[in-house]
Amino acid sequence: DKRQPGKLSELKFGLECGGSDGLSGITANPMLGRFSDYVIANGGTTVLTEVPEMFGAEQLLMSHCRDEATFDKLVTMFNDFKQYFIAHDQPIYENPSPGNKAGGITTLEDKSLG
């Protein structure tokens, strides 16, 4: 295999969450947001994974939708995941782990954004 030039518009990047702490909201996450904005502005694609990790950051993510159809799809996805959690008696807004809390995360919003 040899490296070859390509277009950013031909690439798709999957973004996976790592361990959240009190600094990730001012370091890694903003950098990945700017990276995503750059990739998308140049015709590429970024994909966030782990929808439950987005609970608490819905409004911020929805504000980045390119059009109303995308916004509606995102709202539906969030609502469907929340209904799944409710149907299986799983807590939605109690996600921070002991490790997150030790790192300075106190709420789901802190974890989702940081």
Labelled PLM ranges:
Residues 10, 15, 21-114:
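Anaerobic metallocofactor- and corrinoid-dependent redox/one-carbon enzyme cores
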Residues 1-3:
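Active-site cavity-forming subdomains of large catalytic enzyme subunits
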